Regions:
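An N-terminal assembly and electron-transfer interface module characteristic of large anaerobic redox
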Residues: 1-292
Length: 292
């Protein structure tokens, strides 16, 4: 009825207003591909989907799942990701649901209909993991969970042997952790010395068990966060700028002093902005303008 009245495709998902935004996102991502992507084949004996071998893979095309302003907090991210894969791998990145390739299309669902053609999917938020698994099951498309342009989120400083907390959506948090570890390993020195930082990833939102490391934390209340800061006394905290005052208050309550900004490296405890739109309603572009 709605499709006829609006003259456009309509999908429905069950939401009750009692969950966080990423639960609805997860359902929406999955339903978009279930509805509009070319179908796989069903093995009648097992009644399970098997890869549709009739869909021809187009080498040089990569799908990017999970790009939304709420998760990425950067409206320029699709452009940066497309440039990254073009320059690094000579491949075309298809950024579903966000970016110029969506807005300029005569039909924003064209890329979804051709989703089975990409050679690989990149998952940049936990809410898109279920959709990636569906596409793997339906078309045999492998996926990788990462944030390809993570280097710009991690300032150039000494992270060796530091105790670090990263608060963001899980995939970006994990990518930042991996990038910090990579930088620690690159530092010249005695190979027998462990230069690695101790890094915990936490989030106010979806935390997939399969993407978690031991000690990662799902935050529920502000008190949970403040108790964590007081107890663990982190050297460096990456979090949305809205959380900076809360972080300072927690350190004061613990009697360990205030935190400094990233450029004030002589101070022990450092707070580094890791803007997350779902936390503050602010984009990275807005925060940069305020700092300028």
């Amino acid at each position: 009825m709605c499709e006829k009245k609006l003259n456009m495709p309509v999908i429905t998902i069950d939401t009750d207003g009692m969950e966080l935004y990423d639960v609805g996102e997860e359902k929406a991502w999955l339903e978009l591909f279930r509805t509009f992507a070319g179908k796989g084949m069903i093995d009648k004996a097992s009644e399970r989907a098997k890869p549709n071998l009739d869909i021809e893979k187009k080498q040089g095309k990569i799908g990017v799942l999970g790009l939304t302003p709420q998760d990425i907090s950067d409206l320029q991210a699709p452009k940066k990701i497309r440039e990254y894969y073009q320059e690094k791998e000579g491949k075309e990145a298809i950024c579903y649901c966000m970016g110029e390739n969506v807005c300029r299309s005569t039909d924003g669902l064209d890329n979804h209909r051709k989703a089975g053609e990409v050679e690989k999917n990149i998952v940049v938020s936990p809410a898109a993991l279920a959709a990636a698994k569906y596409l793997e099951k339906t078309f045999g498309t492998p996926y990788e969970v990462t944030y390809p342009i993570v280097e710009e989120l991690v300032p150039d400083m000494d992270y060796r042997r530091k105790k670090i907390l990263i608060v963001h959506q899980q995939v970006i948090g994990n990518a930042m952790r991996a990038e910090i570890r990579r930088r620690c390993q690159k530092v010249n020195g005695d190979p027998s010395v462990d230069n690695n930082a101790v890094i915990t990833v936490a989030s106010w939102f979806m935390m997939k068990q399969e993407l978690s490391e031991e000690g990662d934390i799902s935050l529920r209340e502000e008190d949970d966060y403040m108790e964590l800061i007081k107890k663990e006394d982190y050297d460096i905290v990456f979090a949305d700028p809205m959380m900076k005052r809360m972080t300072e208050d927690a350190y004061k309550m613990a009697g360990t002093g205030c935190v400094a900004d990233a450029h004030e490296t002589e101070r022990k405890r450092i707070f580094i902005d890791a803007t997350h739109f779902a936390v503050s309603g602010k984009l990275r572009e807005e925060m940069k303008k305020r700092e300028a």
